[in-house]
């Protein structure tokens, strides 16, 4: 009777062996090629291949890889019907081929680089692509680069463009299939785009950061539910900002997102509402609002914004910081108590849940006073949670909690108050 060891794995079907190899690091699965003639090329047929030059080049090549080789590798996998392509390119001299946007098989495409790489957007034909992620990429010289990207992706559902630019300062995203969109442009360029157009009627999630455009010819977000907005003024606009005249106009864009249910605004967006908006639209569907704050931006637009959220349930402040301005003395020009009167946006507020994140940054005296105003004036408040930016277990948490609970809560006597470490937020 044969009781010696048996190679049961080699008797498995090749498809199953390739599937098993797909769970190993590429360098380990490649080592199986020495087992026998049958195993020699099996690792190359695994459904996922990861090429990392820091692993494959031993000793590391001091001058990197030859740019032409990178192009041929990319074209090779595209011709072989790859479904998921993830390119992280940090090779000097590489200009990615425009054919990276031509594939009948691709379902997911991700291109990321350590610095701006150029891709000429000639023809885009990605009929099966559902997810497209581009990071730090310079698109070609045409005026319709952004439009070409979406028009050539017939079933695209998710589009992420982080620091993606073209030589023409226009941005246009038009797609009936798109559900999630991230358009995040760095502030290092300090320039207003000429035109930004959104025609995405089925979009439900938007993350958008940019300088205020000269115009928004079309903003179609009829299905939008959740939006994170980081609009900003350029340094020139900021220097010329005045209460007497607008230095830009983001009104059309803001009108386009007024049907959202969940909204997060950067501190700079508050400044845009103040100096680049004819009037703040009414957010009739908004139930959760998050406001990010810093010491260089005032709250002049906040009272009008809160007034125009008639069914708001949850209000979140990331910090209670703001720049003190002449409007702080106006009852409807800020939320602080320098006017000596209660802002009507608080006394009529429908908010039930109030959350304060990053509490304690840059001192707590003024922030405690601000929370006291909330407790005294917001009539429907049921829950206040303060996330204290202090080490866990510190006595300060108990002290602040006790102080807040001792405040007179005339407007919301049954409000539950919690103070917890910010690390839990």
UniProtKB/Swiss-Prot annotation:
Keyword Repeat attributed: yes
Q: Which PROSITE patterns match?
A: FBOX
Can you say where the LRR repeats lie in this chain? 86-113, 138-163, 185-210, 264-293, 294-319
Residue ranges annotated for the F-box domain, each copy included: 6-54
This chain's protein is named F-box/LRR-repeat protein At3g59250
Report the Gene3D superfamilies cross-referenced here: 1.20.1280.50, Ribonuclease Inhibitor (3.80.10.10)
Q: Which domain of life does the UniProt lineage start with?
A: Eukaryota
The answer on whether this UniProt entry bears the keyword Protein biosynthesis reads no
Keyword tags: Leucine-rich repeat, Repeat
């Amino acid at each position: 009777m044969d009781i010696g060891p048996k190679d049961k794995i080699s008797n498995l079907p090749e498809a199953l062996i390739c599937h098993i190899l797909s769970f190993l690091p590429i360098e380990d699965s490649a080592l199986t090629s020495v087992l026998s003639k049958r195993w020699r090329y099996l690792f190359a047929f695994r459904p996922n291949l990861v090429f990392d030059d820091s692993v494959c080049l031993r000793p590391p090549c001091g001058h990197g890889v030859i740019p032409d080789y990178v192009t041929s590798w990319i074209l090779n996998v595209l011709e072989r019907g790859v479904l998921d392509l993830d390119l992280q390119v940090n090779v000097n001299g590489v200009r990615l081929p425009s054919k990276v946007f031509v594939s009948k098989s691709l379902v997911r495409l991700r291109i990321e680089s350590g610095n701006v790489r150029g891709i000429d957007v000639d023809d885009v034909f990605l009929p099966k692509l559902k997810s497209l992620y581009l990071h730090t990429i310079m698109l070609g010289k045409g005026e319709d680069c952004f439009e070409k990207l979406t028009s050539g992706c017939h079933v695209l559902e998710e589009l992420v463009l982080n620091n993606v630019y073209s030589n023409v300062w226009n941005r246009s995203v038009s797609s009936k299939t798109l559900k999630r969109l991230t358009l995040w442009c760095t502030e290092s360029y300090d320039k207003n785009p000429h035109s930004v157009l959104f025609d995405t009627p089925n979009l439900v999630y938007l993350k958008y950061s940019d300088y205020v455009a000269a115009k928004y010819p079309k903003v179609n977000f009829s299905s939008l539910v959740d939006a994170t907005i980081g609009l900003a003024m350029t340094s020139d606009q900021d220097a010329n900002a005045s209460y007497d005249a607008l230095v830009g106009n983001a009104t059309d864009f803001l009108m386009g997102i007024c049907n959202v249910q969940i909204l997060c605004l950067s501190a700079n967006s508050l400044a845009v509402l103040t100096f680049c908006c004819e009037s703040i639209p009414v957010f009739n569907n908004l139930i959760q609002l998050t406001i990010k704050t810093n010491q260089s931006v005032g709250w002049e637009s906040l009272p009008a914004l809160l007034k125009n959220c008639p069914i708001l349930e949850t209000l979140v402040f990331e910090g209670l910081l703001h720049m003190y301005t002449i409007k702080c003395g106006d009852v409807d020009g800020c939320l602080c108590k320098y006017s000596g009167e209660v802002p009507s946006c608080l006394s009529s507020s429908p908010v039930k849940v109030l959350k304060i994140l990053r509490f304690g940054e840059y001192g707590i005296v003024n922030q405690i006073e601000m929370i006291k105003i909330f407790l005294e004036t917001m009539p429907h408040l049921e829950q206040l949670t303060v996330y204290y930016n202090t080490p866990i277990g510190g006595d300060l948490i108990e002290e602040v909690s006790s102080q807040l609970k001792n405040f007179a809560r005339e407007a919301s006597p049954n409000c539950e108050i919690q103070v917890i470490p910010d690390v839990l937020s």
